[in-house]
């Protein structure tokens, strides 16, 4: 349902690329921003980036997994608190505030990015959100769920509801198809059926049968998938499930803007560079690995990716920088909108940064 006008990033077709290395070296710095749009929100004038995404930060409960690389546990040095530690309470008040925020944004086309902790962990919250989305359907040109799939595996209402809400895709995270290796990295609660490989596979098939495309998300790391051989085995497993799109994401560049904790130490110890995979698949001389075809490259305001075709699967190799994100956030233009559990709308994942205001 994505419209032609909605363009959150810049895609360059392979036919226009003579030297992919210049984009690999420049990465997100090759992104050219469009002119911002001025909007009045809660009585103040703000500049918004065209094509931005809106995230109702999904934390109706604490997360039911404890991924070793969890970005929601990263504490930026300017953060006074983490949204992950303040769960949503008082649904009537919360959804009334979200309704007011969406009403004020009417006419500004956005993408809906349903992420945060685990959006499917509390089905009643998700179903109510989807009902409100139906009221504001015209606001969102693209709708994406980011999930570990846990609630989709246990509540039969959720997948049909996503299909009725016309979600463009569900991005389901899986670090490895080997159940034990995946559990070592994603650390699901022992009572979560999705931790089992056969449950995950059946959930992927069922989501696709209901008409919601699935993109599998694999976070590159040295405990799981890190080499081209690992990548190709993962793709073979994905193809067997009928999946048409897989993204391999490098752990984001953190710089020195985060407080040291368990997650930053794990990331530093287990980072696997996506550039190494890019150079193996398409080298500096333009030779492409057998079975792979470059489709193009995409630049965003804090990320860069290359898109390939391998067999029936579209493959994305992606890198990003939370430092670039922080710098863009401080540019005076809201790059993203996040509706936090406190009913505050912000232009940042950090709830005390770029605060538009509270919609109570």
Question: How should these model regions be labeled?
Answer:
Residues 73-93, 105-122, 136-154, 164-200, ...:
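Core AdoMet radical
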Residues 93-101:
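Internal amphipathic alpha-helical repeat/solenoid segments
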Residues 23-94:
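Canonical Radical SAM [4Fe-4S] cluster-binding loop centered on the CxxxCxxC motif
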Residues 124-131, 153-162, 226-234:
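Distinct, well-ordered alpha-helical segments
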Residues 102-106, 160-166, 204-211, 238-240:
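Acidic (Asp/Glu)-rich catalytic clusters
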Residues 83, 180-197, 205-328:
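Radical SAM enzyme [4Fe-4S]-AdoMet core and its adjacent flexible, acidic
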Residues 1-26:
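Intrinsically disordered, low-structural-confidence terminal and linker regions
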Residues 15, 73, 77, 323-360:
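Flexible mid-to-C-terminal extensions adjoining Fe-S/redox cofactors in radical SAM and related proteins
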